[in-house]
Amino acid sequence: MKNQVKKILGMSVVAAMVIVGCSHAPKSGISKSNKAYKEATKGAPDWVVGDLEKVAKYEKYSGVFLGRAEDLITNNDVDYSTNQATAKARANLAANLKSTLQKDLENEKTRTVDASGKRSISGTDTEKISQLVDKELIASKMLARYVGKDRVFVLVGLDKQIVDKVREELGMVKK
């Protein structure tokens, strides 16, 4: 009898927890942070929140490979936040460029074929891409900055000629 009471009591507690846990209204996908972000980017240029592939088609940015980032302004030090955002944007640019070059290199017909007959790039190719991109990243420059209410947005770019130079050093066809 005691075991039955314990089971019923235990099941009741579990059921109550499930009911309480599920009683919250479903989230709409719009949180305070999303609202705050929309407010912070209200009136910002297209490159701040727009698709970078579309931004790259603007005449102003057509000759560069782009990266962007943001940083919260701390202690009203916009310069520090700009430097932080620029460093993040360069890191994003490097990661995107490495990924693009690896994908392009995989598509090159001159690459090695693995045991299953698929083209693949070797670890040395990946390492070489990383080294070349890191070496040329110093040539990237800040193209634009937008200072919002509480954060700084930065757009950086690397000239296509430098990207072509990296492609050439990898033995790839120019795009």
Curated annotation (Swiss-Prot):
Record carries keyword Signal: yes
Membrane association type: Lipid-anchor
Subcellular location: Cell outer membrane
Pfam families assigned to the protein according to its UniProt record, in alphabetical order: LPP20
Lipid-linked residues (S-diacylglycerol cysteine): 22
Leader sequence residues: 1-21
Keywords per UniProt: Cell outer membrane, Lipoprotein, Membrane, Palmitate, Signal
Top-rank lineage group of the source organism: Bacteria
Known function: Could play a role in the pathogenesis of H.pylori by serving as an inflammatory mediator.
Descriptive protein name: LPP20 lipoprotein
Taxonomic lineage from the root: Bacteria, Pseudomonadati, Campylobacterota, Epsilonproteobacteria, Campylobacterales
Gene this protein is translated from: lpp20
